[in-house]
Amino acid sequence: MIGRTPEYIVAVRPLKDGVISDNDMTEAMIREFIHMVNGGAMMKPRIVLCVPSSVTDVERRAVVEAAMSAGARKVFLIEEPIAALIGAGVDISKPNGTMVVDIGGGTADVAIVSFNGIVQSRSIKMAGNKFDQAIIRHITQKYKILIGEKTAEKAKMEIANVFDPTGEKKMTIRGRNLLKGLPESIEISDQDIYDAIHENAMEIVEQVKLVLESTPPELVGDILSNGCLLYTSPS
């Protein structure tokens, strides 16, 4: 709905940068999710919610309170890196170290997980939404074409390359020519997306380096052998 609503409808993001930005809307959203699952039954469910690994105690309490107000009987919180590994089918109960880079809409979490817990982690408010805004700015500055968030996200998902762009991967996007005020279609390449988000992506890479530097040698050896799980979700 972002960018497509009439003036009398305001589309909001209940969550921003991984934490609650609008308590009322967050509560309403969770209440709707509960209704979708239990079909309006009177029984209050138990809920598991994911939070970034770096959230404060105050932010955790805000999430729990919103869910309880929405109709939850009990609320369990789980860090997003652990949820990503479980969702990928990784057995986190083993003593082997597993690295995960979870890039969401508001935050990117980097973590080393072993024995059902996080050994080392870092979280940064640099993720999908910031990438989208960087693409919008770049296209505006270079082509004088204003595009929407959904167009930027689509370009990111389809042709982004943050390490070795060739300029051969291309797609057509539509926006408004800021000089003429008229709709216009242009062709962009992976080089455009690289120029827009490379610097932001390197901030996440830096977090990966910092986590590895503070990880015990035995677990680093596991990561060297097993690699890293990269998990991304839509903005």
For the regions a language model picked out, list residue spans one by one.
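Nucleotide/phosphate-binding catalytic cleft detector across ATP-hydrolyzing
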Residues: 1-103, 111-228
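Conserved small/polar residues in nucleotide/adenosyl-binding loops
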Residues: 231-235
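Conserved Rossmann-like nucleotide-cofactor binding loop
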Residues: 106
